[in-house]
Amino acid sequence: MLLILLSVALLALSSAQNLNEDVSQEESPSLIAGNPQGPSPQGGNKPQGPPPPPGKPQGPPPQGGNKPQGPPPPGKPQGPPPQGDKSRSPRSPPGKPQGPPPQGGNQPQGPPPPPGKPQGPPPQGGNKPQGPPPPGKPQGPPPQGDKSQSPRSPPGKPQGPPPQGGNQPQGPPPPPGKPQGPPPQGGNKPQGPPPPGKPQGPPPQGDKSQSPRSPPGKPQGPPPQGGNQPQGPPPPPGKPQGPPQQGGNRPQGPPPPGKPQGPPPQGDKSRSPQSPPGKPQGPPPQGGNQPQGPPPPPGKPQGPPPQGGNKPQGPPPPGKPQGPPAQGGSKSQSARSPPGKPQGPPQQEGNNPQGPPPPAGGNPQQPQAPPAGQPQGPPRPPQGGRPSRPPQ
């Protein structure tokens, strides 16, 4: 493809330079990017000015109606999006402005720029698809709309701005090795998948925020509040997930490892990042329907049980009595906090699944009063799902 583009560019340079001296002035110059675009068709038969030499990405896409953007070069962020039916101002590539972009009815866009070069301006007109983000680079702003999910950034790269509009996703996703952050937004928001081997964090709640469980040394952030808030990306494997969703649609950013989660924002505020591994998950999501993410691997109890008037109680961990069972209606459950293992505050509102049970068995939803042993407020995951919490 590159060779073909280069050859076309060379031919265009030789033939088009003479013809398009006059025409090129009328047209807005297009961006040069690695591959010059051949003259695109214009009103009558007018050859476009000479394309730039090879090694320069072409810039401007055709104008009018819907114009698909060319693929962005790898490793470079895409250029500015197109504008209505107005011809775009040409981008000036490094020292080599390309000839004017095609004008008139249909103008196919020139060849995409070679890798490592930013593409020219995106197409103009009603629909403007955003170019694909280059690999290894944070993507530009995600599409707008209440349903668009923020793009996942590549490992080690902060994610670009989340989609705009009702939903504002929280901060950057975790580094590589961490599952990405924000779940899709909209009526139902599934929680991000919990990392393997760790009980998932807080169960979803009604419109009431649950009082955060703050075990000593690892305070859990407050639960999300408001309508539908998709939870941010789940922490890396072995880490409990951070705070649940909050008002509006806001995906939560990934929590940094080894840090307790702060209180999540409320209402239309973006949620605080999730807590790192070894830390109890933040508050469960609240609001409309928030399905929780996938359950943890076998042998680990899943965090929040499903919502609904009835709250099934999860199996207690072996040898540890569980704290008080979940309560129906809008009753907050007072968790028994045995020394070294205080359970966080129970959920509130009609459908409040209890916090994550200890990892005894599949996905126990609510902890039960386990057999003789130490009365545990929140059951400790005997299998190492979660480190024991210091006494409050």
Curated annotation (Swiss-Prot):
It comes from Homo sapiens (Human). Pfam families: Pro-rich. This is Basic salivary proline-rich protein 1. Residues 19-28 have a biased composition (Polar residues). GO terms for cellular component: extracellular region. InterPro entries: Pro-rich. It is found in: Secreted. O-glycosylated. O-glycosylation on Ser-87 is prevalent in head and neck cancer patients. O-Glycosylation on Ser-330 has a 5 times prevalence in head and neck cancers. Proteolytically cleaved at the tripeptide Xaa-Pro-Gln, where Xaa in the P(3) position is mostly lysine. The endoprotease may be of microbial origin. The modification Phosphoserine is found at residues 40, 92, 150. Residues 48-83, 91-144, 152-205, 213-243, 252-266, 274-324, 354-392 have a biased composition (Pro residues). Residues 1-16 form the signal peptide. Residues 53-357 are annotated as: 15 X 20 AA approximate tandem repeats of P-P-G-K-P-Q-G-P-P-[PAQ]-Q-[GE]-[GD]-[NKS]-[KSQRN]-[PRQS]-[QS] [GPS]-[PQAR]-[PSR]. Glycans are attached at residues 40, 87, 150, 330. It comes from the Eukaryota. Residues 34-47, 325-334 have a biased composition (Low complexity).
